[in-house]
Amino acid sequence: SLTAGHCGFRDLREGPHKFTGPTGGKLLGAAPLRQIMVQEELKEVRVFAPATVANVACGYDVLGFAIESPGDEVVARHSLEPGLRIVQISGDDGKLPTEVSENTAGVAAQDLLRHLGMLDRGVELEIHKKMPFGSGLGSSAASAVAGAYAVNKLIGEPLTKKQLLPFAMAGESSADGAWHADNVGPCLLGGIVFIRSNQELDIAQLPGPENLWAAVVHPDIEILTKVAREILPREVPLENVTQQVGNLGGLLCGLIQEDYELISRSIHDVIAEPRRQKLIPEFYRAKRDAMAAGALGFSISGAGPSVFALCEGEETARRVGAEVSRVFSEAPIENQVYVSRINPHGVHVVD
């Protein structure tokens, strides 16, 4: 929800931006703040940041896409008390800290305010978690993106979405120490995002076929990201690297050319999936039945336990989602199914 009028629009040059790595929010190539015309500040803003599927099989740490739901909501409003405060968190069963420096949304928002020289600005945040923790759906990234985006909107939108990337990255990194944009990028920008360099935050949005759908299933089991990363090999045979690079290139070409057959031939992970699948009960059966139901490809979302299938058309995606859900239910493992187009918008303001 936007509460207030508006005046002039931003006059911010939208040329290519380069970012440093984990710098605490430095921007390179951005227009100086004195050159930026911002919209009038708002009294309150509510934003929604969507779940994301990272890695997309063959794009480990360099490829991700956004889905329509679930996601997190953050409300930002002005306060007479100086500084940033988190005044409410819901949907977390008391797990998340309200201390700004220990909360992903708080870190992202604070890093942004520090960059803008506004640390004394009074801002309150409400965080409403509406997606499962440790799901492999980018929960930490969604909160970080929502925190940075909401505060940027509240103070008149001095920065573009792409310029918010390092601040959201700092927020997510505060949760697990990792620095990879395959969740934050698509959550912030929407669509399918390819990361050429995580250190430089050199990213590109990719087009995709209009009728490309995702079926995402989250089984109610817990996989610690730390465990999922430690299980991966430190060294990879050259033959596997060649296969993976070929699959990634094929997937990117298939998306750009809207070639569903090439997409299907390319959604194969020969590095992470063979090791991580053992952490997900019934993974093999779920993949087999998803492919039999018409999926283009099937793999693990992020570090898991969520799994995803890319499909041509909504009908196929719903059929695949139902089949995968059945496999987990028979285990028996409670699960949730999310069937969605690729979300082209990313984080956005909601009523």
Name every feature range the model reports, one short phrase each:
Residues 216-278:
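Active-site rim beta-loop-alpha module in soluble metabolic enzymes
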Residues 255-351:
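Glycine-rich, charge-dense phosphate/pyrophosphate-binding loop(s)
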Residues 119-202:
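Gly/Ser-rich oxyanion-binding loop with an adjacent helix/lid
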Residues 77, 187-198, 309-312, 350-351:
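Short beta-strand-to-turn element immediately C-terminal to the catalytic PLP-Schiff-base lysine
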Residues 37-135, 153, 157-159, 189-190, ...:
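ATP-binding N-lobe of GHMP and related small-molecule kinases
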Residues 12-16, 20-21, 26, 30-33:
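Short, low-complexity intrinsically disordered segments enriched in A/P/G/S/L with frequent Arg
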Residues 82-85, 225, 315-321:
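Short, conserved charged micro-motifs
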